């Protein structure tokens, strides 16, 4: 098992002054490693599609006007922290990878964060969702893109409580992501007068949720919070609809993507509330990008795949601006000033590594409301980044001491 399953070279046109421009680029090439799950539970929301969006970012970077060559490599962490950290260590020590991007699965993300912390390698954690990554585990070499458990947990909980959902039962995937979502959402619920009636845990990749859903039903909670991700959330939603739970209890998906809605269908998913930082049909820019992706992948991108594009492009531009691919200089360059991200809008990166941008609350459309395939969301509310993400002073990031 090598973990390296693909290598794609993307060379920019050589320009005058290339040698000088690349003087601080290690090995005369910037290598970006897409580390994700290529054949397991996250292959649809990440997998090969994340490699495509990383390549699109490299193409759009086009050498940064300085002839900087970019190479994209891919590794499969198999949702195992030891495998993910071993790939990261080999990429750092042997293969000259300068930045790792993507990394769905919070346990793997935290392990890779440890490898990158004291190195020259950047971690662009566009799919690692635990808020601990920019809290107690923050690193000067790590940037967390897209979302985190605090943002999705609290904004979704607030929206549901405003709609009368005062009592909650959690279905929680039993690893770092699920624990963090339940913690962050539960703290908000109880601090605002709600009650957590109970929780039931399940392994990653569970297929039978019947006993857990019966526990949720017996709790008589107003809301069943799905503290998990695809495909677990999709399986739970389908089975909840089959059992008739949605007649008396409301479901909230904290971390679910348009791919999951497509897989389970509007009949089962209709009325579901969920938080996303990106939706392919949000505006002209997201639609244009999604058309490019769809030409290669046959469907629109997920939020995680969009995050790989934006994080990779921002990193490459920081490399060009700082003149080096050393994370200890490139990451500070990323944090230097706010910027207009093509997919996520007005964006800035805080000192703890948290990327701040707007988050969006969507409701899944009824079948008769959809205009066709992938037209699944109705925008309910846009939450400014300053309200969605945890305040800088509250995360406990050691970098701020």
Task: Name what the model sees in each region.
Residues 16-20:
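N-terminal signal peptide c-region/cleavage motif recognized by signal peptidases
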Residues 4, 14-15:
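Leucine-biased recognition of intrinsically disordered, low-complexity hydrophobic segments
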Residues 2-4, 8, 21-401:
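Extracytosolic ligand-binding ectodomains
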